[in-house]
Amino acid sequence: MKLWGGRFKSETDKLMEEFNSSISFDIRLLKHDILGSIAHAKGLYKAGVLTEDELNLIEKGLKEILDETNVGEIPNDEDVHSYVERLLTEKIGDVGRKLHTGRSRNDQVATDERLYLRDEIDKIKEDLIKLIDTLKEMAETYKKAIMPGYTHLQRAQPVTFGHHLLAYVEMFKRDLSRLEDMYKRVNVMPLGSGALAGTTFDIDRKYVASLLGFDDITLNSMDGVSDRDFVIEFLSFASITMMHLSRFCEELILWSTKEFDFIEMDDRFSTGSSMMPQKKNPDAAELIRGKTGRVYGDLITILTVMKGLSLAYNKDMQEDKEALFDGIDTLKMSLKVFTEMIKTIKVKTDNMEKAAKYGYMNATDFADYLVSKGIPFRTAHEIAGKVVLYAIERNLAIEDLPLNELKKFSDVIDEDVYEAIDLKNTLKKKKTIGAPTSIQS
């Protein structure tokens, strides 16, 4: 069913119809298109455009379509809007043709997308909270498990695995904050903007918005139909969240190698090789890392679509939906898979602590010890560096060097140095808020 055609002399080319059609992907908006149409019909009734009987007939018909429609084979309509209107007209007759009064597909689809995204935000919020809670529980379990902290992927200073996990909790909390803040900009209704210049019918937009649970209405009709900032903002959020997942996955992949051997992935989230019998591959983590680029692509798609569009609506904007839907689907699945995967890893705490001990990661604490004895930090830093080199050449840890050898570097060094550079003590001595102390981890 076409919703236009009166001014055309010839039929649309079949190739153009196929090229123009969006029903294959915007059918996903069916529920929200119907909900928006029911609210619009009530607005038309309040404005005196529909009689009470007509409203009841339209509402009943739309609800039946929602209950009855099981989209298997993609219908042969231009888009979800024409599909719903065709079904309604077939069901209730010419009264169905009144539904689109005072409405354009331009404000209709913008409303549908906001309704849809609003629901998806609620689901993603639940997934993020579940991930954050999972990481917090694991951090409590491993709050005393010492491991190397890295800069430049080189061993730097000792931390705890619990503290490392809580670093990602902070990232995902920021993601959650972005998601919650975004909701207020998504939850604004453009319906009533018409094609671009409003409508002559006295539709109470705030009344319709209240029926649909919107907090507010858009205030400029041209912006209302052409705004896709909410899609861009969501995909920006999704890209940042996926980036955080990808960083964590990269670490898990590294840690699962024999070269690190800090963790072992569970069989349920690993795969094997068709040729090499010994292989156990961290495919779940690798796929999340790979799909991050896919979500970046979704964001770049809509940014590129929008960058050259004059006001108001342009058909280019049809291309926003597949990017939005793909970004939502990919993020949701990645969050679910990651949460289940991280819960099942085997953490090799002994290997982590061993790596921390033999990485000279107490060198900074050695320098701080010298400072506590009155030596300026720059001098202490140089002395500590020489001690590290001395220990490396002898294949020893700093704490394994005898006191008489340490005294060669400075006569302020005494027996208490060994307590100062003990790994567990170095962690306990960290005093600043946010440091990896047992309380904070």
Swiss-Prot record:
InterPro entries named among the record's database cross-references: Arg_succ_lyase_C, Argininosuccinate_lyase, Fumarase/histidase_N, Fumarate_lyase_CS, Fumarate_lyase_fam, Fumarate_lyase_N, L-Aspartase-like
Pfam family, one: Lyase_1
Pathway: Amino-acid biosynthesis; L-arginine biosynthesis; L-arginine from L-ornithine and carbamoyl phosphate: step 3/3
Organism: Thermoanaerobacter pseudethanolicus (strain ATCC 33223 / 39E)
Protein family: Belongs to the lyase 1 family. Argininosuccinate lyase subfamily.
Gene Ontology biological-process annotations: arginine biosynthetic process via ornithine; L-arginine biosynthetic process
Listed GO CC annotations: cytosol
This protein's record includes keyword Amino-acid biosynthesis: yes
Gene name linked to the record: argH
Lineage: Bacteria, Bacillati, Bacillota, Clostridia, Thermoanaerobacterales
EC number: 4.3.2.1
Keywords: Amino-acid biosynthesis, Arginine biosynthesis, Cytoplasm, Lyase
Signal peptide boundaries: none
Localization: Cytoplasm
Annotated Gene3D superfamilies: Fumarase/aspartase (C-terminal domain), Fumarase/aspartase (Central domain), Fumarase/aspartase (N-terminal domain)
SUPFAM superfamilies: L-aspartase-like (SSF48557)
Name of the protein this chain belongs to: Argininosuccinate lyase
